[in-house]
């Protein structure tokens, strides 16, 4: 209990916060009571309860970590999120590529796509139900969209040249991507509902790696238009680049 905590000893050790808790198991059901304590002020920050089955114990642990992290930093925790990544294994002069998702610590791996052709640049939808990525299965890079629940997938681009670096907007309505169909790598957006491409840059330099601002109204991207690779900001409404 909190009364049993010797805050002075923890201060000497340089600890800033403590997390204490207790676990009650009843059949297949867990009830976890946990508290966050601030050492310097000997203050209770919060006490909360998390409940779930044995199968949910990993998710409960991640949820508790998220709560503690956000209370300390003011930033939403990422412990309950997942990562998408590509692995490659070479055997008998052939390379097998796998698009995978897993918990952030690598647990609960799940195969999404397996191919003898390179897979690149997976990007999550905001609701974490879909991925977009680049696959070379058509003989050139193309952007695909895939539903994680039913494995349905759709090819979104089929242009000559580079089709790459897809990035899903936070509002879920558009993709930012790089196309070189007109000769030079440029930044485009793709309206997922209207299936319409809009070109946003027109420069002799290489523009690539677009990423969205949280409000979905602007992009940051990498360009060597200044002589070396630098990060630029593009306002979508007026096309201004800074």
Can you annotate each of these PLM segments?
Residues 1-30:
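Short, solvent-exposed, polar/charged sequence segments at loop or secondary-structure edges
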Residues 40-111:
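C-terminal/domain-edge helix-coil "capping" segments
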Residues 76, 88-98, 114-117, 134-143, ...:
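A flexible loop/linker signature enriched in serine peptidases of the S9 family
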Residues 77-79, 126-127, 170-171, 214-215:
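Residue-level detector of Asp-centered blade-edge/turn motifs that repeat once per structural unit
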Residues 108-113, 152-157, 196-201, 242:
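A short beta-strand motif characteristic of beta-propeller blades
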